[in-house]
């Protein structure tokens, strides 16, 4: 199913990076990986592009830890096109179609800093989202955040999909074999920041990692990894989650684990290689485009690509367990985590199961979208979004508290004052959707032609920008988000699970209630808004999405109501039925 991303991202996602800029005329900055010239961006901000932080992970370096690069006498050149790690073309990459795009020579970063800044400034290190299968550093423009909050912002690329997270006996060299190559890329980029960010006016002793969706997931991963010690000092997870696989699950020989898709055993077979006899040389000889397209052609549900408990990058006991273990804790690091009030509308908002489409003018133009059953839609969105808060906010923060962390903060993003159009009521269909908060943090509306609907030029939107940028800037400076328009933002604890509802025009509020998956499942059990198959699908998603899948919870739910319902097969049947009737399960 194509998601709402297709409508809103392709219509102008890359506009942020595409604005014309001129060289600043300043002397190049000489880093330990090359000399780089700055460009003058809007708002009297300097930006440095396409700085390598490791050797290209190609040939023998594929599926290995990033290797240090040391080239100080080379003048680096800004690339003509965005540097993108191999991935399938998609709305997130800004390229339409189904082909593989990108290059394995992709380990680069950008730096944005206020012009003429005095003294070492807080550093904000952005980790992009995209399910760890898509996305890149050029997607967002944090120049306004840098200027108004007086911070230095670093954005990075990291390996994605099967090139970023992969385990196979042919690649193992005995105990200590690693599998989380994308995570190691992020760690390598943080190492570059420690060595070089002072040259750009940044403070290497005050680095805040922040990321959204898979980026938030990776932020939490760095809190669990023993290899990231000392590389950052504060952390913000936006719509993150905690999930991982054991090496045995990730390999999944002969599909030992029936619910795990895209295991490396099956993946090797899909490449046309003998899974029993394949060698590291065989795997590294495969074309990167073939690797990406083979991966995306394989059936999948929710289980990959996954962080792998390799015992090196991520402790063998597991990602979730490591977050709660004082052995791996970084207790001096303040952490803020949050979720959005209507997370899942980004995926289901154009699904024909939930919406109708009419073409009042012509089918060559986007359809007019309306909800089939607004009450059922809102209920579905509410439960799934509460589930995201439970698994991506309350659970990890509670784990961190038990590991010894003292400064923890939580939020829920609620802003939904979009301007409705003739074609779609954005506030009703989308609302406070997944990723919609990012525009307020960067201080720049995205989404091109429909940006004026998504983020209208209103007092409400301006107020929200001020709230978000101020809170994130405060956190980077002090480790606390500070008050919101005079309202104190109390820290989070298991006994007092405070979170700030982030909304504009006086609608913000401090609350203290934790989301719990079992309670949410009980709410679903009591509901009369869903039919039998919808109840099972929602129970399955709440039990298996975002956190480590709890298949037993699903089997036992509501006295075993859905124990004999194969939701994966059911969803496939529904999708195929929609495709047969409409040609696609999406309204686009």
Residue ranges and their predicted role:
Residues 106, 176-198, 256-265:
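Alpha/beta-hydrolase active-site loop
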Residues 216-228:
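Short glycine-enriched nucleophile-adjacent loop
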Residues 5-14:
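Bacterial N-terminal signal peptides
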Residues 129, 181-185, 213-216:
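Active-site loop->helix "elbow" adjoining a glycine-rich segment at hydrolase catalytic centers
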Residues 17-180, 451-464, 478-483, 539, ...:
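Non-catalytic accessory segments of hydrolases
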Residues 200-212:
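Alpha/beta-hydrolase fold nucleophile elbow
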Residues 229-242:
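A conserved short beta-strand
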Residues 247, 282-462, 471, 478, ...:
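Substrate-gating cap/lid region and adjacent catalytic-acid/histidine neighborhood
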């Amino acid at each position: 199913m194509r998601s709402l991303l297709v409508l809103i991202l392709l219509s102008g996602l890359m506009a942020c990076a595409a604005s014309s800029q001129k060289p600043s005329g300043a002397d190049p900055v000489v880093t330990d990986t090359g000399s780089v010239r700055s460009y003058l961006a809007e708002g009297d901000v300097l930006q440095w592009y396409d700085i390598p932080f490791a050797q290209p992970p190609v040939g023998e370096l594929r599926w290995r830890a990033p290797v240090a690069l040391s080239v100080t006498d080379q003048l680096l050149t800004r690339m003509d096109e965005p540097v993108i790690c191999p991935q399938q073309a998609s709305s997130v990459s800004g390229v339409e179609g189904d082909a593989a795009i990108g290059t394995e020579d992709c380990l680069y970063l950008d730096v944005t800093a206020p012009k003429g800044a005095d003294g070492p400034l807080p550093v904000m290190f952005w980790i992009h989202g995209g399910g760890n299968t898509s996305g890149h550093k050029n997607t967002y423009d944090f120049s306004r955040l840098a200027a108004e909050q007086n911070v230095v912002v670093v954005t990075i690329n990291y390996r994605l999909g099967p090139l970023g997270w992969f385990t196979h006996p042919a690649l193992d060299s005995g105990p200590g074999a690693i599998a989380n190559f994308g995570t190691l890329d992020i760690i390598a980029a943080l190492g570059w920041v420690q060595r070089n960010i002072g040259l750009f006016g940044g403070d290497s002793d005050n680095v805040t990692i922040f990321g959204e969706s898979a980026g938030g997931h990776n932020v939490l991963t760095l809190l669990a990894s023993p290899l990231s010690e000392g590389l950052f000092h504060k952390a913000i997870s936006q719509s993150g989650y905690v999930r991982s696989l054991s090496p045995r699950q990730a390999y999944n020989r002969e599909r030992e684990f029936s619910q795990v898709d895209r295991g490396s055993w099956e993946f090797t077979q899909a490449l046309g290689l003998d899974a029993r006899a394949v060698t590291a040389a065989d795997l590294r000889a495969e074309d990167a485009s073939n690797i990406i397209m083979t991966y995306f052609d394989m059936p999948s549900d929710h289980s990959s690509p996954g962080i792998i408990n390799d015992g090196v990058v991520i402790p063998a006991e597991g990602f979730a367990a490591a977050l709660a273990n004082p052995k791996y804790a970084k207790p001096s690091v303040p952490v803020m985590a949050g979720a959005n009030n209507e997370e899942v509308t980004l995926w289901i908002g154009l699904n024909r199961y939930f919406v109708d489409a009419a073409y009042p003018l012509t089918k060559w133009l986007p359809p007019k979208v309306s909800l089939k059953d607004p009450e059922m839609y809102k209920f579905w969105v509410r439960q799934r979004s509460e589930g995201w808060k439970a698994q991506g906010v309350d659970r990890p923060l509670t784990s961190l508290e038990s590991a010894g962390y003292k400064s923890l903060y939580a939020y829920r993003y609620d802003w939904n004052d979009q301007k409705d159009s003739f074609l779609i009521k954005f506030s009703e269909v989308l609302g406070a959707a997944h990723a919609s908060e990012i525009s307020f943090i960067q201080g720049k509306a995205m989404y091109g032609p429909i940006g004026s609907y998504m983020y209208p030029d209103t007092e409400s939107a301006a107020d929200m920008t001020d709230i978000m940028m101020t809170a994130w800037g405060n956190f980077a400076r002090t480790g606390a988000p500070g008050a919101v328009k005079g309202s104190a933002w109390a820290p989070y604890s298991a006994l007092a699970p405070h979170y700030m509802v982030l909304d504009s025009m006086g609608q913000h509020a401090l609350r203290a209630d934790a989301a719990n998956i079992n309670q949410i499942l009980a709410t679903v059990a009591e509901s009369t808004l869903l039919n039998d198959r919808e109840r099972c699908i929602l129970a399955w998603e709440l039990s298996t999405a975002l956190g480590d899948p709890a298949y037993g919870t699903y089997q036992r739910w509501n006295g075993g109501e859905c124990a004999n319902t194969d939701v994966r097969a059911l969803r496939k049947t529904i999708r195929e039925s929609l495709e047969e009737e409409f040609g696609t399960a999406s309204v686009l």
